[in-house]
């Protein structure tokens, strides 16, 4: 790969962005970053705490800054948070600074992958998880598609197979 382009993974919670990102970075010998992990590193607190103390709006501002900073790097794989695309600024930066791959994942798969994960603030509500995920999908799906250079379904493949498919799609 002569020019090291960035690869940005977007999609809902439970899509496998972090795991698929790991395989992509290993295969392509690119550095891997995870925006949620970077927020935790910078704040010294976990995402749930940031949500509790600063609310979703405060978290999104931090996320916007982290993605702005990381997307300026070259030759990286970045796994974004599921709601990162809510910010027009973030959508513009991702589109302008790399290849955006939307990991499309049905609600059923998201439920199966997130049901035991207590670290997801948007699922820690009275609202049933299926309703939360459906509402988020309705809000975010158009935004994912708006900036996606590629759309890859993740429901029938392992994370490693999805990473291989992305490498083939990108011709890398």
From Swiss-Prot:
InterPro entries: P-loop_NTPase, Shikimate/glucono_kinase, Shikimate_kinase/TSH1, Shikimate_kinase_CS
Subcellular locations according to the entry: Cytoplasm
Cofactor: Mg(2+)
Record keyword Cell inner membrane present: no
Textual note on the cofactor: Binds 1 Mg(2+) ion per subunit.
UniProt-annotated binding residues for ATP: 14-19, 120
Alphabetically ordered keywords of this record: Amino-acid biosynthesis, Aromatic amino acid biosynthesis, ATP-binding, Cytoplasm, Kinase, Magnesium, Metal-binding, Nucleotide-binding, Transferase
Binding site for substrate: 36, 60, 82, 140
Residues noted as binding Mg(2+) in the record, renumbered to the chain: 18
PROSITE patterns: SHIKIMATE_KINASE
UniProt xrefs under SUPFAM superfamilies: P-loop containing nucleoside triphosphate hydrolases
EC number: 2.7.1.71
GO cellular component, one term: cytosol
Biological processes per GO annotation: amino acid biosynthetic process; aromatic amino acid family biosynthetic process; chorismate biosynthetic process
Gene3D superfamilies the record matches: P-loop containing nucleotide triphosphate hydrolases
One Gene Ontology MF term: magnesium ion binding
Pfam families assigned: SKI
Catalytically driven reaction(s): shikimate + ATP = 3-phosphoshikimate + ADP + H(+)
Quaternary organization: Monomer.
Physiological role: Catalyzes the specific phosphorylation of the 3-hydroxyl group of shikimic acid using ATP as a cosubstrate.
Family: Belongs to the shikimate kinase family.
Protein's name according to its UniProt entry: Shikimate kinase
